[in-house]
Amino acid sequence: MTSRMPTVVPCLLGPTASGKTAAALALAARRPVEIISVDSALVYREMDIGTAKPTAEERAVAPHHLIDIVDPTDAYSAAQFRADTLRLTAEIHARGRLPLLVGGTMLYYKALTQGLNDLPAADAEVRATLDADAAREGWPALHARLAALDPVTAARLAPNDSQRIQRALEVFMLTGQTMSALLAAPVMQDDSAALWRFVPIALEPSERSVLHARIEKRFDAMLAGGFIDEVVKLRERGDLLPEMASMRCVGYRQVWEYLDGAVDYSTMRDKGVFATRQLCKRQLTWLRSMPERVVVDCCDPHATARVLEAIEALL
């Protein structure tokens, strides 16, 4: 392990619609920056409108990484994110440029900075078996199965939280150990992250209502911009299912329900806005658990300038 001081890497984190992209591009206009996306939805190709993916014009301002890297049928894990980000950070730094992490998937950021528990990779065959069981019995029945095996994990999951129920059962089927036991084990340590000091700059709202209004406006703009047609095209591929991680992304799940005829347009729109606000709430809870973060009020009309000042002070 090298004895040099860790190099500071600024990380611009915040909930959806908090102004991360604008601030990142403003920094790119001042410094030779390469942006590493910290967003579990932006990894998917063919999912542009509903993920608020940076436009071609925005991506031309600075190189962007970890965007459009997997097909919507594929899984992309926090472990993959960590490995990719550590590799990219070193490569960008070696080019004499500034790596800038930007996003709101706090699980990815936690994996990067705190390491990972020794959990197995996703297994397509096991997942297919569990999906078939769920189609036959329903997710509440699989939740009950999980409760018998791992009551600690089951107690913190809703009976219809298909993604996490499936993952907990998958882990048990692959390892013979419960998710709660594996998560309680010591985190695997490595030296690869010790080269860097990842510093979180958090865009947080002083007034939640301001951010909620932005979220509503953004979701309506997505709908006006062709979001439904985007999901129609994804469905027409014929190889995507609503249970897949890509189609569970906020907004896509609600539009899929609408196209199934399960809800009307108005209900779909309201559920999409509500789900985005709930995601925002979870993101803010994660952020506020980081005492080391530098907070910038995203409701401040000069928020972008405040972010630039905070980053420049670190470098």
UniProtKB/Swiss-Prot annotation:
GO biological process: one example: tRNA modification
Protein's UniProt keywords contain Magnesium: yes
Chain sites annotated for binding substrate: T16, A17, S18, G19, K20, T21
Subunit field text: Monomer.
HAMAP family cross-referenced by the UniProt entry: IPP_trans
Binding positions for ATP per the UniProt entry: G14, P15, T16, A17, S18, G19, K20, T21
InterPro entries reported in the protein's UniProt record: Dimethylallyltransferase, IPT, P-loop_NTPase
Site (Interaction with substrate tRNA): T105, R127
One MF annotation (Gene Ontology) recorded for this entry: ATP binding
Name under which the protein is recorded: tRNA dimethylallyltransferase
Entry keyword set: ATP-binding, Magnesium, Nucleotide-binding, Transferase, tRNA processing
Reactions this protein catalyses: adenosine(37) in tRNA + dimethylallyl diphosphate = N(6)-dimethylallyladenosine(37) in tRNA + diphosphate
Cofactor(s) listed: Mg(2+)
Job of this protein: Catalyzes the transfer of a dimethylallyl group onto the adenine at position 37 in tRNAs that read codons beginning with uridine, leading to the formation of N6-(dimethylallyl)adenosine (i(6)A).
Family per record: Belongs to the IPP transferase family.
Ranges where the record places region Interaction with substrate tRNA: 39-42, 163-167, 248-253
Enzyme Commission no: 2.5.1.75
